[in-house]
Regions:
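Structured segments of extracytoplasmic/periplasmic soluble domains
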Residues: 136, 177, 184, 188, ...
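Short, solvent-exposed turn/loop segments enriched in Gly/Ser/Thr/Pro and often Arg
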Residues: 146-149, 198-202, 389-397, 457-463
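Surface-exposed patches in mature extracellular/periplasmic domains of secreted proteins
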Residues: 193-196, 255-264, 386-390, 453-461
Length: 503
């Protein structure tokens, strides 16, 4: 009898943490068929509807009984696509998920908080619950936030309601979610002092904003960026510009006040979202005090260890063909010396050259240079380590890419980190190897703020002139800064643009 009782106790203790308590009530997980408890939808803020539309997030309301977090929440309102229709959306969207391997609330595991991409207009947290990482010993959180006009519209009348600033509601949602994590993650077996934020595309840009925002100070200790940074002076939208775009959007909708716009159906707003010009985070003097490149130059940012990666064929999602006219228009926009040099580095004499040059230009301007600028500037003005990575693995499988690819397209990194090849070793042996390496490096970084660990190729901190960039391609090996001559040409041009803006 004693042996049976002991065995029952051990079995009970070995179960995932299927029920716990948060500040608004009790919540119950769903098992994922392995050794994790997955809470698919926990409200971290009140529904941003009615008078709360275009306002900072407010605390979620308590509930009675036990909230069964069995299904992911609906998508935030956004334009319809083939895979998401309006009946799948709701303005009541401020939810997060938690996947935990903890068996008790006392385990104090590191925490990884993911912010999804989607150009600040689209997508959903529910596709990325991160069981692949949680199984390696972290508590994985995925956050939803407001997008499109509902998340980023600024207007002078909204500024009057909020001490002079407006817009950036989606970023305020992310900060509010991180504050919720600080208060509640212990009850999932997580350690609030060991939070790493990570994101892809617009989610990576969000992570960079959080690294720069004084409102996010102390909410995380490390950051991973996958294909996104906010260093470009070409992307700077200030409060006055953003409010002008908001005024134009209101006029297009034939509304005369914020009150009228708050009465509109979210579907009508998102159906016109393409007409909303400023769907980007705003330099509002509050969430983002100054252009982020300026904050980094001055050393005024949250100085935490960072791991920054982009992909070798990012532009494959944008182009499957490029005409002579498209090529000429793109490179004709560059002034004198930069236009001439660009045509050397990005030739366009043949159809194939034009296609690959436009893809490479998209990669280098949109992802490569921002990653380089972030890494080099933080090395110069910060104290925390910087790690740099480059995903070059080509696979038959891709997320969004068009036509022939020469490497990893935009968002392909998600396949490797989510474990898409974990059970396909025979068909995709190299992809499986890369996926396992990336997952372990990422989790090590969350655990120790250093990606290195037993059995992994050594990854040194980034140095511009040395082979310190970890390239993932049929394994992992160190290379010098990829596409270096092109990146330095763009760096020279961006310095010129910044000088014009200052003058």
């Amino acid at each position: 009898m004693m042996v049976c009782g002991l065995m029952t106790l051990v079995a009970t203790e070995a179960q995932p943490l299927m029920r716990t308590h948060v500040e608004t009530g009790d919540v119950e997980a769903t098992p994922d068929g392995t050794d994790l408890a997955v809470y698919k939808a926990i409200p971290y803020a009140a529904a941003p509807v009615g008078d709360l539309r275009w306002k900072a997030p407010q605390p979620a309301k308590p509930w009675e009984g036990v909230l069964k977090a069995e299904d992911v929440a609906k998508w935030p309102p956004q334009p319809e696509k083939s895979y998401v229709k309006y009946d799948m959306m709701s303005e009541d969207c401020l939810y997060l998920s938690v996947a935990t391997p903890a068996k008790s609330v006392d385990e104090a595991l590191p925490v990884m908080v993911f912010i999804h991409g989607g150009a600040f207009r689209t997508e959903h947290y529910g596709g990325d619950l991160w069981q692949s990482l949680a199984r390696r010993g972290v508590v994985a959180v995925s956050v939803e936030y407001r997008a499109g006009a509902l998340g980023f519209m600024a207007h002078a009348d909204l500024a009057k309601e909020a001490d002079g600033h407006s817009g950036n509601y989606g970023i305020l949602d992310q900060i509010f979610a991180l504050q919720w994590v600080q208060r509640n993650i212990r009850n999932f077996g997580g350690d609030p002092s060991k939070v790493t934020i990570f994101g892809e595309s617009a989610g990576a840009m969000s992570c960079h904003i959080l690294c720069a925002s004084p409102l996010a100070k102390g909410l995380f200790r490390a950051c991973i960026s996958q294909s996104g940074a906010m260093m470009s002076p070409l992307n700077v939208v200030n409060q006055m510009q953003a409010q002008m775009y908001g005024w134009m959007f209101m006029n297009q909708l034939k509304k005369s006040s914020i009150e009228e716009m708050r009465q509109m159906d979210a579907k009508e707003l998102t159906g016109n979202d393409a007409n909303f010009q400023a769907c980007v985070p705003i330099v509002d003097g509050y969430v983002i005090p100054e252009p982020i490149c300026d904050l980094y130059e001055k050393g005024n940012y949250n100085d935490v260890p960072v791991l920054i990666m982009y992909n070798s064929d990012e532009g494959a999602v944008d182009f499957d063909s490029v005409s002579v006219e498209q090529y000429a228009q793109q490179f004709g926009q560059l002034p004198g010396q930069w236009g001439d040099s660009a045509k050397v580095y990005y030739p366009g004499n043949t159809e194939e050259e034009r296609l690959y040059s436009m893809r490479d230009l998209t990669r280098d301007v949109g992802f490569g240079w921002p990653a380089y600028a972030w890494a080099t500037m933080q090395k110069k003005t910060g104290k925390s380590p910087v790690y740099s990575a480059y995903l070059a693995q080509k696979s038959d499988t891709t997320v969004y890419a068009k036509g022939n690819r020469r490497g990893a397209a935009h968002a392909d990194d998600m396949m490797y980190l989510k474990g898409a090849f974990d059970d396909k070793a025979e068909q995709y042996p190299q992809e499986k190897k890369v996926g396992e390496l990336m997952q372990q490096y990422w989790v090590n970084f969350a655990k120790t703020m250093n990606p290195n660990g037993e059995g992994l190729p050594h990854w040194p901190v980034y140095e511009e002139e040395k082979a310190t960039v970890m390239q993932f391609n049929n394994g992992a090996s160190l290379v010098e800064t990829p596409n270096q001559k092109r990146i330095r040409l763009i760096d020279d041009f961006m310095k010129y643009v910044r000088s014009l803006r200052r003058n």
